[in-house]
Regions:
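Conserved tyrosine-mediated DNA breakage-rejoining catalytic core shared by Y-recombinases
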Residues: 1-46
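Generic hydrophobic alpha-helical scaffold/packing signal
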Residues: 7, 46, 76, 99, ...
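Hydrophobic (often cysteine-bearing) scaffold residues that line and stabilize catalytic clefts
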Residues: 37, 41, 67, 71, ...
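Acidic, low-complexity interaction regions
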Residues: 65-69, 77, 81-82, 108, ...
Length: 168
């Protein structure tokens, strides 16, 4: 999710439904992304969620633009503290999710759905099929498992690489 979508979301329910602010109004119909909030994220959300509104409240009472700059600056500090040499941005999480999901063989259409991308421009079959919440939930769960247990997926990733590159 983009930061603006996170800040506008009511997190009181276990199932999250939202339309990306970035694409709202650009399509004939705003696509709604639906998935179950993973327990790992729920713990963090509960720490920062205003119980009355369901929105996250970090105690920062300035404009969204200023808050966005503050988050970007803070991510830079965090990366430095963790000895990460690359530039870390809020968008890095979206890119990492997509990369990890692809590495473990999650279909592009499901990755697109989880990221809130339109799936109508990528072939005829996508006009006839629809990603379901359960598929998104499974993909998110599998990516979390991969991040926490990369060795578990090592053999699969190597086999997949061999197949994709037609190595024998």
């Amino acid at each position: 999710m983009n930061l603006i979508d996170i800040m506008q979301t009511d997190f009181r329910k276990d199932v999250l439904e939202y339309s990306r602010s970035k694409t709202k109004g650009r399509m004939q119909s705003d696509s709604v992304i639906t998935f179950t909030i993973p327990s790992q994220a729920r713990e963090i959300i509960c720490r920062w969620m205003d119980k009355r509104t369901g929105k996250l409240d970090f105690g920062y009472k300035f404009t969204y633009h200023n808050f966005s700059q503050y988050v970007t600056y803070s991510l830079g500090d965090l990366a430095e503290e963790l000895n990460i040499d690359e530039r870390v941005t809020f968008y890095s999480a979206r890119k990492s999710f997509a990369q990890y999901a692809s590495e473990i063989g999650i279909p592009d259409g499901i990755i697109d759905y989880c990221l809130g991308h339109s799936d109508k421009s990528k072939g005829v079959i996508r006009y006839y099929t629809k990603v379901r919440q359960k598929q998104a939930d499974m993909a998110i769960s599998r990516v979390i498992d991969y991040v926490n247990n990369p060795e578990k997926y090592k053999e699969y990733i190597e086999q997949r690489s061999d197949i994709m590159m037609m190595r024998g």
